[in-house]
Structure formats: C-alpha cells, structure tokens
C-alpha cells in the first residue's frame, strides 16, 4: 500500500534539488520590485518598524485595514511578517527579498520530494520534484516578491499533509498528536495564504482512499447495506469518520474566523478585473469552464507566460457554438476518465492518480470562481500548488512509459529535454521581471488585447519622465478598451504633465462620463471601484489651477464625498483647496474628517499642522507636527517645518529639539541645502560661530546661489571681526542677486570701515537708493559717506531727509546734531535746511532698523500640504490608472518673518558710526 512507503530522502537528493533551484533562479536576485510588489512592499507601511505588530493582524496583504471597503480582503499576516523581517535586515533593497523567495522555493521543492515518496518510487519522485523545481509557471511566484504568500503557504500545506499521514497507528488506531499538529499547520498555512485551508480536503481524500484503501464502489456498497439495515459500519470506517469530523470541524472553525476577519464582506472588483464575473448566463458559465483548460494548458505548455490575464486577455465565450467549447469538453472528458479510474479501481497506480488530481483541483478551487468571483481571469502564481499534482501525474505517466523497453530510451530523452528547456525558460523568464518596463513589454508580446498592460507600460515610461512616449501607450489602452475609466484618467494626467491642460480636462471629462449614473437608493460603493472616484479628484485638481474656477473644483470634491462619505482622499484634496481659498477653518474641518477615517496617517496630521499655522496657532501646529512624527519618525517635511516653528518661537528650551530634528532631516535629505542653512541659523542664535560657519558653507556648496546662506555667512564674518573674509562672499551674493539690499549695505559698511574705500561704499549706498529712495538704512549710511568726504552741508541735508523718512529714530537725530555741531565749530556758513521732498510725519512709513539683521532663508522650503495616495486596493498600483494626481500645487504659508531684534554686532556698528561722526 502507498501509506507503507518510506518518505525519507537523503542529503544528495536535497543537494541536487537545491542546486537546480539555485541554477534556475540566481538571476532573480538582480530583479527589482515590480507590479504587485509596489503595493505590497514599497507602499506598505506595515513593513516599517514604527508600525505596531498588531496592525499586521488588522490589515490585509497590501496594508489596507480589513474593515475598509477598498481592502482586497486578502488576509496573510504571516507573509507580511516575513516582509517586515526583510525590511529590518535590508529595508527596501530587493535582493534580500528575492533571495528569501528562492530559499523558500527550494524548501518547498525538498518537502515536495518527501511527499512524492509516499506515492512514487525513488526515481519517479525525484523526477516529479525536479519538474516542480524548474517549471516556468513558478516564475511569478518565486521572482515576484508577493509570490511569497504561495511559497510560505505551500511549506505549511505540505507539512500539514505529511503530519496527517502519521495519524494512523497500529491496528488502524488513531494517533491524535499528528492530527492536532495538522490542524495547527493548516491554520498557519491559511494565515500565509487563503488556499492553505484546502489541504484539509487533501487529507480527507488520503484518509479514505489511500490510508483505508477504499474505492468508490466499496463505499457505495457499505452505505447501501447500512441504509437497508443489512449491516453495520465497520470499526475502521467509524475511526475514519471520527478523524474526518475533527478535520471538518476545525476547517469550519477556520472558515468562520476568516469570515469574521473580512467582516462578511467580499472585495469590490470592477468588470475589467474579471469580465466573466459580471456577464449573464450562459456567458459566465461557459467562460469560467473554459478557464480550466486554459490553466491546464499553461501547466502543459508554459511557453507564453503573461503577468496579467485580466480585461480582454481571454475574450468571453458568449455562444455554445464557440469553437473553444471543444477545449472545455475535451478537458472534462480527460479529467472524468482519470477520476473514474482513480476512484473505481484499487491499486497503487489509481491512488497515485487520485492524489495527483486532488492536488491539482482542490487548491485551485479558491481561484476558480466556483464559490465567489475573484479579481483576475488567470493568475500564474495561483498554479503553484496545483502544479504539484501535475508534476506527480507527469512523473507517474513517465514511469509507466519508461517501464516498456521499447520506449525507455525515448522517454529518458524526452524527459531530459523537458527538464532542460523548462529550466532555460525559467532562467530567461526571470529577466522579464527585472523592471516594470521589461515585464509589461514581455506581456504585450503575448497579449495585445489587455488595456491594463498598455497602461502599465505607460506607467513605467511615466516614472522615467518620458511623458510623450507614455501618452502613446495610454492612448492605445483607450483604443483597446474604450470604456476603461482608468485609461482615460491616465491620458488626462499625462496631458497635464505635458502642460496640455485643455486636452487633460477633456480626457477627465470623458472618464467622468463613463461613471455609472445615479440610481436612487443604491450605494455607489457596490457598483464602482473606489479608485474610479479619483476622476473627480483629478479633474478638480486640474481646474483649480484657474483662480476663477475654485468653486467649481470644490463642487467636484463635494460630489465625490456625497457619493462616498468615507472617501478620505476627497477630504484631503478639499482641505488643500479650502486653504487656497483662504478658508482655513473649513480646511480644518475637512482634515479632521479625514482623520476620523484614518488616524494613523502621518501626512494628515502634518497637513492639519499647516492649517494651524495659517490660523496663527503655532502651539497647536507643533502638537500636530509631533503627532505626525510619532507615526512616522522620518517624515521629512514634519521634521523640517516643526524645527523651523521651534526656531521661530524664540524659546531657548526648544532649540536642542529643533537642532535634533534638523539633523535627522539632513540625514534623510543630505542634498537639501535648506537643512544645513537652518542648522547654521540655530548655531548663530546659540553663538556657536564656527559651527554656524560650517553649516553655512555646506549649504552653499550644495546650492552656490543660496541667497540667504551667502548673506548670513557674510554677516557672521562681519560680526566676528572677519570682515575681510565677508567681502568675497558678498561679491558672490551680488553676482547672483545684484539688487540684494542688505548685501549692498553690509558690503558698503565693510568697504568704508575696514577697506577705507569710500568711493566703493558710496556706490553701494547709491545703488540702494536707486532701487528704493525711501530706504532709511541706505540713506543714513550715504550721509555718513558724505561726512567722510568732508561734505558737511551735504551730510546735514542728507540726514534731514533721512529723519523725515524715520522721524522717531533717535540715532538719526543724534547724528544730525553731531554734524551740525561740527558745521558750527568749523565756521561754515549754514544753508537753509529744508527737507528735500518730504517733511517729518507727512507720510507714514515702515520703521526700518539701522543695523544689520539676519536674513531668514527665502529659499527655505515653505510648509507644504501633503497629498495622501491610498490607491492600494488595486494590487497593481502601476495599473491603478485611477490614482489621484500627484503634482497638485502645494499650499504655502506666509514667508518666514525677518528677525528684527538688534544684535551685539549691530550695536558695535552704531558705535563705530558715532565715532566717525565725532571725528575720533
């Protein structure tokens, strides 16, 4: 009997299997994150150490809360946990993820060899394991990182089955430890991927037809006798029944828990994901049945593989006269013949065929649309476990053929060719997964009727900023599938990126017109993929660039919200718009509503902080910045802007934290000069002159024309008695910004006081007055130049005019008195001193300090409103053509105020001026 066969394998066999896997998949280590990997890895915050572990058990495979309708309801927390371990080791470097996938595939192949030993002889089981290890259909499961769900689930799937095979003791007694272990392993397999639960069916078939050796006729005979009262159920059959009941009850419990996890809701898919699922009878049934031979053909002939089989890949079968129905008929005839053979006849061969069929059929049931529609037409990676049964069937058939001496050599040649060609195909197929562009271009070679593939190639080109070429692919997608809302949205977004706003709006309007019309009393969520509602967001984001259409944009946001009150992105985008419309209180309401829907979104807390800045509530703004950083300690804009807010507050106790955040910011953004500049400003506030100099130099090195960094470095030199070092810095500043008033003032002061270059200083001050005749500081300093040139009357007249501009400046009055005293003592005849054009008090002017002050960076990044992209519910975010635009205008707050407080160096400068005027 099969159950009596040894399942042991030796080290040489393990080494051979592992070596073959390594030879086939070594090049997968050089592939990146593509297709579904983007959503599951790059965009999944559950991988980050800052996310609590319990969140893994509350969210789906893609990081979306299971309670949200946009969730795919794919509950695989243990798989996500392995991704998190990868992230802990290498963050987002893809090589470690691909390496672990390859290791898992090798482990599955070795365990599969052990399972094969239960049904096949040593040679045939090795052949089955080798066929499984090299089969090209597995490329998507192994080279695609998200395929780890299949790999992990298969490990525990096979382990559970092997455990169950040990549940039969002497004299047909029940050994409970393996059964308990089986139930545990089934639960673990199911937490890796849902199809893990189907191993229970495999165990039941094994128990009845292999372990107990029953055939279908025997079972019918016993059942008939029992029902007629002519016999009783044998003890062995009762023991079998007990084991089956335990398995069934445990399975039922797992199903109940799984249903509770998804809150009795199925995911929402569009008709583009699985067209047959929304087709009428008999189209739906004919197409679903035809998909079975399609999947079988992929196992038999994996020459044309495609990463995406949705949309128009397989045209619907709408008539019984469709020739493809012959393939369905032939498939069921072959399957039926094998089924009858395996169930009717005793013997090892029939039991091997039966177990192979069960391994092919039962794990495929969740993806078969039998009980519920799925979000794809064909998916190669779901064939990972079913291919085990296929490989057993092929190996068993080869064993039968090779036993005939006439065909023995030919069978070996054919088998060797199959294994070699499959291995080479797998190796070559891995390169297709190197990047998104190579992957989707390879798919288009197989299938040109899938609009999603055209869209995805467009996305890949879009990511490379090749918008012109991307547009061609997006337009082709609309031609292949004219009613694809997402394709039209992609066209609109690309037109926008090409600054062709009129065409962009037309494309968005066309996409909007394809949305289902209002049906009273019917929820939109039940009929529309949530991402399709982003057409309202994208259209509003486009038209709000026109100041006269802000209300129209707001109407679109409100329309989206009315259709889905839980549409978080609509609240976020509307909040941005309301800030632009100078309605911060309403913007605050919008963000608070969004936070009700997602309190763990760091970007939302950041945006709310910006609103509080607009409302002039810096303390509340800082609290919200802090909340954003609690959720995401590396949130770059929150680090930067909260540090600036602390710096502006003037509170000395906040400076260390501000410095810490800026240091974290420059670690995250080492090429951003603003971070170094603001560190320099903090150091200047703390009188750490050498440190300030170092930070300013780093900022200037990264951005040679950084106006504020250049000026403040020059100012720092002037305040630390290094005026001559300041001059070349000022020359550089004025080369880029020849009208920089403060730079001209500082340069003039240094030329006059340090270089004694009176004409040079005079040119600086005169240029200031050419640009701004009312500049008090420039005019006052020009008066000092006149005094230095011994033009006392001119100096007096100049000071009178300056006093008219700033009548309350005591130092100007004092300097005027000094000049007049000098005129009197020198005996110069005094001319009438009427103000030049203005008299004091005739015009109200801004009071301008006479001393140099620090200039706060005008290049320093203003606070920005962040847009939050939550379009993960299409597993392929690249294909998720419905994404809201990423480049909406950023909302800025008022420019950061200049620091007006007088500094010690400025006081020294004033003393120097008075010393000159006193003739000392």
UniProtKB/Swiss-Prot annotation:
TPR repeat feature ranges: 451-484, 485-518, 534-567, 568-601, 602-635, 673-706, 707-740, 742-775, 776-809
Region: Disordered, residue numbers: 829-897
Topology in the lipid bilayer: Multi-pass membrane protein
Cellular component terms per the entry's GO annotation: endoplasmic reticulum; membrane
EC number: 2.4.1.109
Bias-annotated ranges (Basic and acidic residues): 840-858, 887-897
Ranges of the Cytoplasmic topological domain: 1-14, 116-125, 164-171, 220-236, 347-358, 403-409
Extracellular side of membrane: 36-94, 193-198, 258-325, 380-381, 429-920
The UniProt record lists the keyword Transcription: no
Keyword Metal-binding annotated: no
InterPro entries: TMTC_DUF1736, TPR-like_helical_dom_sf, TPR_rpt
Modified sites of kind Phosphotyrosine: 508
Main location: membrane
Glycan-modified residues: 499, 546
Membrane-crossing segments per the record: 15-35, 95-115, 126-144, 145-163, 172-192, 199-219, 237-257, 326-346, 359-379, 382-402, 410-428
Family label: Belongs to the TMTC family.
Function in brief: Transfers mannosyl residues to the hydroxyl group of serine or threonine residues. The 4 members of the TMTC family are O-mannosyl-transferases dedicated primarily to the cadherin superfamily, each member seems to have a distinct role in decorating the cadherin domains with O-linked mannose glycans at specific regions. Also acts as O-mannosyl-transferase on other proteins such as PDIA3. Involved in the positive regulation of proteasomal protein degradation in the endoplasmic reticulum (ER), and the control of ER stress response.
Protein name: Protein O-mannosyl-transferase TMTC3
